Amino acid sequence: MKSAEIREAFLRFFEEKGHTRVASSSLIPANDPTLLFTNAGMNQFKDCFLGLEKRAYTRATTSQKCVRAGGKHNDLENVGYTARHHTFFEMLGNFSFGDYFKRDAIHYAWEFLTGEKWLNLPKEKLWVTVYATDDEAYDIWTKEVGVPAERMVRIGDNKGAPYASDNFWAMGDTGPCGPCTEIFFDHGPEIWGGPPGSPEEDGDRYIEIWNNVFMQFNRTADGVMHPLPAPSVDTGMGLERVSAVLQHVHSNYEIDLFQNLLKASAEAIGCANDDAPSLKVVADHIRSCSFLIADGVLPSNEGRGYVLRRIIRRACRHGNKLGARGTFFHKIVAALVAEMGDAFPELKQQQAHIERVLKTEEEQFAKTLEQGLKILEQDLAELQGSVIPGNVVFKLYDTYGFPVDLTNDIARERELTIDEDGFEREMEAQRERARASSAFGMDYNSLVKVDGETRFLGYQGVSGAGQIVALFRDGQAVERLEEGEEGVVVLDQTPFYAESGGQVGDSGYLEAAGVRFDVRDTTKAGGAHLHHGVVARGNLSVGAAVKAEVDASVRQATALNHSATHLLHAALRQVLGDHVQQKGSLVDSQRLRFDFSHFEAIKAEQLKALEDIVNAEIRRNTEVETEETDIDTAKAKGAMALFGEKYGDQVRVLSMGGDFSVELCGGTHVSRTGDIGLFKITSEGGVAAGVRRIEAVTGAAALAYLNGAEEQLKEAASLVKGSRDNLLDKLGALLERNRSLEKELEQLKAKAASAAGDDLSAAAVEIKGAKVLAARLDGLDGKALLALVDQLKNKLGRAVILLGGELDGKVVLVAGVTQDLTGQLKAGELMKQAAAAVGGKGGGRPDMAQGGGTNAAKLDEALALAQRFVEQGL
């Protein structure tokens, strides 16, 4: 079976078992700052397992795209050199949220693997592990499924602590956890290795193909395991691994999917399609890089973008080792799209963008290699001994993207070695940081957990009645909040919008007889709206009825900005291109902020075009239409999804100007585009590599902004004794007059310097046949001193000159040496000494150098160094 056929068979099997087929989530985890990348099928269901979110289904199946670059699971440096390490892989999974448990999960796995209709693997080739004390799973496998005891292995705590086992999974130090059962395929005695749990288990004979995790406990901070009221199931089977089994090969790189990518990689590089590890690196890395870019990641020097940059550069380096000339990596994207584009349509949609990003980064890396070589040369020049320190190798690798193997090659050419142990210590420290960042980073038992959902009334108005279903103080559920206490109120229904999609939460108040709760902010936990605030009067109790009143003026101003954000997004794609993707936003009552992908600053004419397009849509005054539909129908209509946002099966589609703007959005908006009134961009700039930011105002705030600009124009006109009509002419004349005066001043300075030069030349002293002049001239800048040094060199002949002075509280220094002395005396060396004396730095050419410092009190001492410098140098 081909990889694509296995993927489809798996999803179809579980659909027939009542599971909902759920699309792969983005590689950028939605609303989860604790994860760098999606690295498991369960990531998108994390809140379901935590009990913070309820979905319309209790059974799900997915083929999840995953990235593991670094850390304990998949060391980047191993990719290409082992049979099963990858930066990108697909995880097939089936999930139960409080529905079926161990029995069904085990039977489903066995049926899919061994059933004649499905994978039809020989049963005698399958081994199974269970957690040592999980008798329930063991009995299901042996007594119901029929796996013989000799192919069953109990795995205990093998990692030095209770429940620290290959067969016990935990979300963190506290929270949901439980035993797991793993299924292994036996490749046969001709392959070295032993069964799981044996000393030879790391061999290639027995390969894990499926893991079933049974979340049945909640571990509290004291280490006690409490049974969960609704146990869940999380499973994972690597598509590449099971494909290798079914295609009778021992390396993932031999499966159909990789064979095509290896061929395309060899053609792009211009090398033989053989078993070279470097070729496997390129074929693997094109997958992770392309999918990351398709999901909105761009190369940068931090976070996710930094990981992407490292993977791209590693691929380029390995391509260069194989003889690649020029850019090649981006040429492989087409082969990947042909291989995986049907299963992941985002690859097809983003192909041109992916190719452009990769080519740009390849070109940048060529420059980086050149820079890295210069830095390495500097470090080698200062090296004492024959070993390049590990921290230097790591700095080149980690900070400058300089490949370790290249550093090693250069060291070998110089008969040097690198400190591999020191480098590994630095790498391990980085891995530990990665491991720490990959944990979920939360205490499950301290989270606010609310059963049920709050019905949102805010689309219909800004007020409504509700009943208090829960109260929280300091994160703990309480029955009552007293006057003056801060807390959180949860209602059964509310008009208050909870912060999401970049729109801030509503503010206002909750009121009943003798009671008032001032709502400062509204957020969401699962499906519940949390009203944060303080009891201003009386007290609140669970079960009490209240009137909820949103601050209408703030809500309306926020709606103007949110609707304008949608119009701006559409305009950006018109003006800049379809590669524009939203990277984040902030919408409140004062302004809007919109971050998006783009590679360069926006030109002034483009900014004007954006404003013109948005304001034209505002003037059209079209109706803002909303529709509730399923996610697939919405995407088929071309609705754009918000970056980093999670969507359920049913979504709200917001349309403006017909098909001018169609987006998925749950926020509050105007009724017609004309309600926005006016749109004005206030700033544009870069916030990260490949990410730009526009800030703007609307409505009354836009009018106030323009009125303020008008007042500034009037003030500027008044300063130049003109009017708004002739302001540009007045400013032009003023600038021309200023240039004329500056030119006149330079001429006067030159005359003064010439006169000073005549006076100074007489002060030169002769040392060993050379004239030495050191003088203090306060108030002159570096340019004037340079001109004076040139003049003095011509006057004095064979000479060394050091001039300095104080200007605006800082020291300015210039040194000069005539050409006939530069073989013995260098101006740059003199400058280093003089600048150091005044607490600064300097340098330059052998015949001319500049510097400066901050300690003017030491200037005379610095100038005195000139004579000693000549005495020692001649």
Swiss-Prot record:
<dbReference type="InterPro" id="IPR018163">
    <property type="entry name" value="Thr/Ala-tRNA-synth_IIc_edit"/>
</dbReference>
<dbReference type="GO" id="GO:0002161">
    <property type="term" value="F:aminoacyl-tRNA deacylase activity"/>
</dbReference>
<keyword id="KW-0479">Metal-binding</keyword>
<dbReference type="GO" id="GO:0006419">
    <property type="term" value="P:alanyl-tRNA aminoacylation"/>
</dbReference>
<comment type="function">
    <text>Catalyzes the attachment of alanine to tRNA(Ala) in a two-step reaction: alanine is first activated by ATP to form Ala-AMP and then transferred to the acceptor end of tRNA(Ala). Also edits incorrectly charged Ser-tRNA(Ala) and Gly-tRNA(Ala) via its editing domain.</text>
</comment>
<comment type="similarity">
    <text>Belongs to the class-II aminoacyl-tRNA synthetase family.</text>
</comment>
<dbReference type="GO" id="GO:0000049">
    <property type="term" value="F:tRNA binding"/>
</dbReference>
<dbReference type="GO" id="GO:0045892">
    <property type="term" value="P:negative regulation of DNA-templated transcription"/>
</dbReference>
<dbReference type="InterPro" id="IPR018162">
    <property type="entry name" value="Ala-tRNA-ligase_IIc_anticod-bd"/>
</dbReference>
<dbReference type="InterPro" id="IPR009000">
    <property type="entry name" value="Transl_B-barrel_sf"/>
</dbReference>
<keyword id="KW-0648">Protein biosynthesis</keyword>
<protein>
    <recommendedName>
        <fullName>Alanine--tRNA ligase</fullName>
        <ecNumber>6.1.1.7</ecNumber>
    </recommendedName>
</protein>
<keyword id="KW-0963">Cytoplasm</keyword>
<dbReference type="Pfam" id="PF02272">
    <property type="entry name" value="DHHA1"/>
</dbReference>
<dbReference type="InterPro" id="IPR012947">
    <property type="entry name" value="tRNA_SAD"/>
</dbReference>
<dbReference type="InterPro" id="IPR002318">
    <property type="entry name" value="Ala-tRNA-lgiase_IIc"/>
</dbReference>
<dbReference type="InterPro" id="IPR050058">
    <property type="entry name" value="Ala-tRNA_ligase"/>
</dbReference>
<keyword id="KW-0547">Nucleotide-binding</keyword>
<dbReference type="GO" id="GO:0005524">
    <property type="term" value="F:ATP binding"/>
</dbReference>
<feature type="binding site">
    <location>
        <position position="562"/>
    </location>
    <ligand>
        <name>Zn(2+)</name>
    </ligand>
</feature>
<keyword id="KW-0067">ATP-binding</keyword>
<dbReference type="Pfam" id="PF01411">
    <property type="entry name" value="tRNA-synt_2c"/>
</dbReference>
<keyword id="KW-0862">Zinc</keyword>
<dbReference type="GO" id="GO:0004813">
    <property type="term" value="F:alanine-tRNA ligase activity"/>
</dbReference>
<dbReference type="InterPro" id="IPR003156">
    <property type="entry name" value="DHHA1_dom"/>
</dbReference>
<keyword id="KW-0820">tRNA-binding</keyword>
<dbReference type="Pfam" id="PF07973">
    <property type="entry name" value="tRNA_SAD"/>
</dbReference>
<dbReference type="InterPro" id="IPR045864">
    <property type="entry name" value="aa-tRNA-synth_II/BPL/LPL"/>
</dbReference>
<dbReference type="InterPro" id="IPR018164">
    <property type="entry name" value="Ala-tRNA-synth_IIc_N"/>
</dbReference>
<feature type="binding site">
    <location>
        <position position="669"/>
    </location>
    <ligand>
        <name>Zn(2+)</name>
    </ligand>
</feature>
<dbReference type="GO" id="GO:0005829">
    <property type="term" value="C:cytosol"/>
</dbReference>
<keyword id="KW-0030">Aminoacyl-tRNA synthetase</keyword>
<keyword id="KW-0694">RNA-binding</keyword>
<feature type="binding site">
    <location>
        <position position="566"/>
    </location>
    <ligand>
        <name>Zn(2+)</name>
    </ligand>
</feature>
<keyword id="KW-0436">Ligase</keyword>
<dbReference type="InterPro" id="IPR023033">
    <property type="entry name" value="Ala_tRNA_ligase_euk/bac"/>
</dbReference>
<dbReference type="GO" id="GO:0008270">
    <property type="term" value="F:zinc ion binding"/>
</dbReference>
<dbReference type="InterPro" id="IPR018165">
    <property type="entry name" value="Ala-tRNA-synth_IIc_core"/>
</dbReference>
<feature type="binding site">
    <location>
        <position position="665"/>
    </location>
    <ligand>
        <name>Zn(2+)</name>
    </ligand>
</feature>
